[in-house]
Curated annotation (Swiss-Prot):
Disulfide bonds: none
Native species: Listeria welshimeri serovar 6b (strain ATCC 35897 / DSM 20650 / CCUG 15529 / CIP 8149 / NCTC 11857 / SLCC 5334 / V8)
Subunit structure: Homohexamer; trimer of dimers.
Active-site residue list: D129
Enzyme class (EC, first level): lyase
Residues holding substrate: M77, C78, H79, M114, E115
Gene it is expressed from: moaC
Species classification: Bacteria, Bacillati, Bacillota, Bacilli, Bacillales
One BP annotation, GO: Mo-molybdopterin cofactor biosynthetic process
Pfam families: MoaC
Keyword Lipid biosynthesis found: no
Source species, domain of life: Bacteria
Name under which the protein is recorded: Cyclic pyranopterin monophosphate synthase
Record's function text: Catalyzes the conversion of (8S)-3',8-cyclo-7,8-dihydroguanosine 5'-triphosphate to cyclic pyranopterin monophosphate (cPMP).
Length: 160
């Protein structure tokens, strides 16, 4: 099998979950990021705690952490893993953009890239849901894997 061959298909060319039985357990870590753009007033109201549905960042943080833990229930070929760390942080540009960063860690046989990506995606969707009454034009953009470490493929860092 060549390095780029798809591993999620069986001999009948049907979907399967990859067998990781013989892989070694190693520490694996992934960082992902997403940005949600909104009106200036929306971001100001989030920071002032003046969104009718509640504390937007606290709810989005919990939603992102929950999403990391439930990724295998959402993405069919993801292995259920024991998440040993899931964290969500927020940074704004002081104007109209809020950047969400997740860090997910495990010790296991498969990586946590999908968990980190799912975490930032769900956190961004939660922000959209909580603020859509005042800003339906919000845009979720640039969701990507920033870095991953551990496992056979080693370290990956996105280009700046």
């Amino acid at each position: 099998m060549e390095k780029d061959d798809l591993t999620h298909f069986n001999d009948e060319k049907r979907a399967k979950m990859v067998d990781v039985t013989s892989k070694s357990e190693t520490k694996r870590r992934a960082i992902a990021r997403a940005t949600i753009h909104m009106n200036e007033e929306t971001l100001a109201r989030i920071h002032a705690g003046k969104i009718a549905k509640g504390d937007v960042l606290a709810v989005a943080q919990v939603a992102g952490i929950m999403a990391a833990k439930k990724t295998s229930e959402l993405i069919p070929m993801c292995h259920p893993i024991m998440t040993t760390k899931a964290d969500i942080s927020f940074e704004d540009d002081g104007n109209t953009a809020l950047t969400i960063t997740s860090e997910v860690v495990t010790v296991g046989k498969t990586g946590v890239e999908m968990e980190a990506l799912t975490a930032v995606t769900i956190a961004a969707l939660t922000i959209y849901d909580m603020c859509k009454a005042m800003d339906k034009g919000m845009r979720i953009e640039k969701t990507y894997l920033v870095e991953k470490t551990g496992g056979k493929s080693g370290t990956f860092k996105a280009e700046a």
